[in-house]
């Protein structure tokens, strides 16, 4: 090999080394750029995932709030229905009792009639027993008589139809009950018709 050939070989070798170094630098730059791109891509992917997670959390919270509102509404509905049912049970007999009151009045009037005949007294005793039995059954279903005579006049329970002047009663006291008043639990079915002292 001649000196010239060796010089060409050395130049070629140097050139190859230089190209290898350049290639190595280029590869490093490409890897560095790729690595930076990967980091940026990973960072933006993480940001996207975090946004998606946050959005999903908000949706879950929103659905949970809707559920809690619906649950509260349902509980209120159940309570309202229970109260309405209880009220219906309490006052279910109101219409029937209101219709029976005139019959009770008629029985009371019949019992006030006096007679001397034994058959009349026997009949009256039977009517009295039926009357007491009927009142007992009605009282067991919540019917109560409104107390009137001697009580202070109360427009919630009494209906004044006459005035009286009686020194044995206080002013504004009921002196006489003309028609018995009744209430069902705490609801007045019919006020007592009364005479009130001045």
From Swiss-Prot:
Q: Which GO terms describe its molecular function?
A: adenyl-nucleotide exchange factor activity; protein homodimerization activity; protein-folding chaperone binding; unfolded protein binding
Its family remark reads:
Belongs to the GrpE family.
Q: Where is the composition biased (Basic and acidic residues)?
A: 16-35, 46-58
The main place the protein resides is cytoplasm
Q: Does the record's keyword annotation contain Isomerase? A: no
Provide one Gene Ontology biological process annotation: protein folding
Q: Which Pfam family is one of those matched by this entry?
A: GrpE
Q: Which UniProt keywords apply?
A: Chaperone, Cytoplasm, Stress response
Question: What does this protein's UniProt record list under function?
Answer: Participates actively in the response to hyperosmotic and heat shock by preventing the aggregation of stress-denatured proteins, in association with DnaK and GrpE. It is the nucleotide exchange factor for DnaK and may function as a thermosensor. Unfolded proteins bind initially to DnaJ; upon interaction with the DnaJ-bound protein, DnaK hydrolyzes its bound ATP, resulting in the formation of a stable complex. GrpE releases ADP from DnaK; ATP binding to DnaK triggers the release of the substrate protein, thus completing the reaction cycle.
Q: Which organism is it from?
A: Staphylococcus carnosus (strain TM300)
Quaternary structure annotation from Swiss-Prot or TrEMBL: Homodimer.
Q: Where in the cell is it found?
A: Cytoplasm
Fetch the InterPro entries from UniProt.
Answer: GrpE, GrpE_coiled_coil, GrpE_head
For region Disordered, the annotated ranges are 1-58
Would you tell me the Gene Ontology cellular component terms? cytoplasm
Q: What is this protein called?
A: Protein GrpE
